[in-house]
Amino acid sequence: MDQGQVDFAAVFDDLAARDARETTVPLGGVDVRLVRVPGGGEGRWDSHDDSTETVVVWSGEFTVEFRDRTLLLTKGQCCVVPVGAEHRGTSPTGAEVVLFRKTPG
């Protein structure tokens, strides 16, 4: 069920209290994924053939690696992962990240 609004701080507090890593919340037809990335965490290579993904750092530092470049994002910064781009995320010190993904059409 689409909630219409999301309190990111409250969701991250809830994840921490439950020692959970992530949750997905539907919002206006967009899947909003909130992820707590542990220090030293390194994601697997991934790509999305049907959607872009916007990555927003809520806290900490998060690196988005592409095959041809690397972006270091800090609190309040974001980037867009284009359709089909291979990428993965890493964080040497830990981060809280919000991912927005909508399939076109």
PLM-predicted stretches and their roles:
Residues W58-S59, T74-K75, T93:
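A cytosolic small-molecule/anion-sensing beta-strand core signal
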